[in-house]
Amino acid sequence: MSRLTLPKNARLLKRKQFVYVQRNGRCCRADQVTLRVVPSRHSNTRKVGITVSKKFGKAHQRNRFKRIVREAFRHVRPNLPGCQAVISPRGNSQPDFLKLSEELLQRIPEALPLASSSRC
């Protein structure tokens, strides 16, 4: 039986990985989240990092946001091109899972061909 979690090799874990995507990635705003996307060095690698500031809310709210985003990314990951993405919330509301999945599936490929512009 397979584990229904986002594997560790599908996550950005180190600070330098986040900094690389923040500096070199293209910013794309969706209704619920802000994305920074950079093409992956390896065509099949799809990784996600999630950042949530303390302004978003208490720890349980930040953790819930991260769980929802991880699960949405896990569901759409097979349909995405090779990329590394950093996802941050817009506003203080919890995202809707289905809407977030659709936004990720639509916005990440849109951001990839033009990854040279980093303005948000």
UniProtKB/Swiss-Prot annotation:
Gene3D superfamilies: 3.30.230.10
Organism superkingdom: Bacteria
Catalysed conversion reaction: Endonucleolytic cleavage of RNA, removing 5'-extranucleotides from tRNA precursor
Cell division as UniProt keyword: no
KW Transmembrane helix (keyword) present: no
Pfam families associated with the record: Ribonuclease_P (PF00825)
InterPro entries per the UniProt record, alphabetical: Ribosomal_Su5_D2-typ_SF (IPR020568), Ribsml_uS5_D2-typ_fold_subgr (IPR014721), RNase_P (IPR000100), RNase_P_CS (IPR020539)
Keywords of the record: Endonuclease, Hydrolase, Nuclease, RNA-binding, tRNA processing
Cited PROSITE patterns: RIBONUCLEASE_P
GO biological process: tRNA 5'-leader removal
Any one Gene Ontology cellular component term annotated for this protein: ribonuclease P complex
GO molecular function: 3'-tRNA processing endoribonuclease activity; ribonuclease P activity; tRNA binding
E.C. numbers: 3.1.26.5
Subunit structure: Consists of a catalytic RNA component (M1 or rnpB) and a protein subunit.
Functional summary from the UniProt entry: RNaseP catalyzes the removal of the 5'-leader sequence from pre-tRNA to produce the mature 5'-terminus. It can also cleave other RNA substrates such as 4.5S RNA. The protein component plays an auxiliary but essential role in vivo by binding to the 5'-leader sequence and broadening the substrate specificity of the ribozyme.
Family membership noted in the UniProt record: Belongs to the RnpA family.
NCBIfam families the UniProt entry points to: rnpA
UniProt-recorded name of the protein: Ribonuclease P protein component
